[in-house]
Amino acid sequence: MSGKVYLVGAGPGDPGLLTLKGARVLASCDALVYDWLANPELLDLAPESAARVYVGKKGGDHTMSQERINQLLCDLAGDGKTVVRLKGGDPFVFGRGGEEASALAAQGLAFEVIPGVTSAIAAPAYAGIPVTDRRATTEVAFVTGHEDPNKPESTMKWDALAQIGTVVCLMGVKNLPIICAKLIEAGRDPATPAACVRWGSTPQQQTVTGTLADLPQKVAEVGLKPPAITIVGQVAALRQELAWFEKLPLFGKRIMVTRARSQASRLSEGLQALGAKIIEVPTISFLPPEDPEPLETAVSMLEDFHWVIFTSPNGVEAFFAALGEAGKDARSLAGCKLAAIGPATAAVLKDHGLIAEVTARTFQAEGLIEALEAHGITGQRVLIPRAAQAREVLPETIASWGNLVQVVPAYRTVRPPESTMLLAKALSEGLDAITFTASSTVTNLMEMLDQAGRDELARQSKEGGLVIAAIGPITADTARGYGLEVKVQPEKFTIEALIQALSAHFAS
């Protein structure tokens, strides 16, 4: 039985502009064939088992000819695979998607087109330029700048284009001087506002503005390279009023997120929403404890405990996973009082239908100790399911009040093997900030570096403009112990507060 090919538009660069339908077929494909302009983050939406084939074309460097790409799609579909052909922008707007669809149709193979947000409208929009506006024009033309404007058989109708309110030219940086000259020659006013937008909708976005007459010179002066979109028309002047993306507080900042990949999304998405370029280098990942028996035993005798204290969201999830394995659910905690370090831990408990009697306002053991002390706990049996390696101040203090405390490892943290390579790449490309959300993220990152690397990171944090952001005082102290200067530490030890503090730092 033959498979099916989905021609999916990846959008202009911002991964959030992928359509819901595009994300859905990506999540269930057997093979992914993708272009240079498709955001690499989108590849993570495909199953780990899916084959990934890069067929990108960058300038004159073609990984694979169009004919071979067509045949590859036919071969994969002929083998019964569900294939996603991920193309930058929209597959049917200067994307050669029509040729690929024709090749599939010629062999009787099933295909479906899932349109994408074309860069022809998205890049101008992110630069604050509407391609149509009743105050300026109600017509727009999309053209390719990849064609040689001087070839005898050119299909470019310059006389007609010169009369259209907005002309949007894709892939035209190389030929920009000729394109502008041709429009002026055809009667377009040389003083017409114009703009070039490179890497539109991404944190690398770069915008150059001018007139039809001087834009080529301005583009050359700043060294603007492809991929870029050119907009010609009165609408380009609206950028002065409507520019928004490049004004975001973290626009263009390269920020490393060191949380575990499974937990990074909230921090990464919050920073991305403020314009940052996120580099995820997970310095920790979470695994079950090497010996699961202590947790299993504790779960089997919950009726013996008066209190269960959770010190992290991971501890909650690991505990409930063990509870489920034992064939139990939250009802087993009916006789226990619950305590949580920080609102994030309490929120995960609430997701399981439970409300903590005691919640520390800050995400640190000392905050929970203060809250529990006010409760007057003494003569109680207390269970603390937590990380295999953790500070002892909490169980020791509670035990000193006359309680019987049992600590069981619910999970352990390890350093992902691929992170050393990711860290080296990130540091070589340059960073504006590194975020740390736990002491273990600091320790693991620094242990990936040799002494020279640690010294250089410390130097950059003090002299080179690298901002170290720590979620709380314990994490900050760990960073300082490695010689790092911590410039950002929120008063409230939460992800949201960390994002706000980092934004405020760069805005100041």
Language-model features, listed with the residues they occupy:
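Class I S-adenosyl-L-methionine
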Residues: 1-15, 20-117, 122, 221, ...
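Class I SAM-dependent methyltransferase SAM-binding "motif I" and its flanking Rossmann-like core
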Residues: 3, 88-164, 208, 358-364, ...
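Conserved beta-strand elements of the Class I
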Residues: 6, 30-33, 84, 141, ...
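Signature of uroporphyrinogen-III synthase
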Residues: 12-13, 59, 65-69, 77-79, ...
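Short, well-ordered beta-strand core segments
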Residues: 30-32, 52, 130, 167, ...
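Acidic, glycine-enriched active-site microenvironments
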Residues: 102-106, 118, 122-125, 131, ...
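A short alpha->loop->secondary-structure connector
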Residues: 105-109, 131-133, 185-191, 326-334, ...
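Conserved anion/nucleotide-ligand pocket segment
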Residues: 150-195, 401
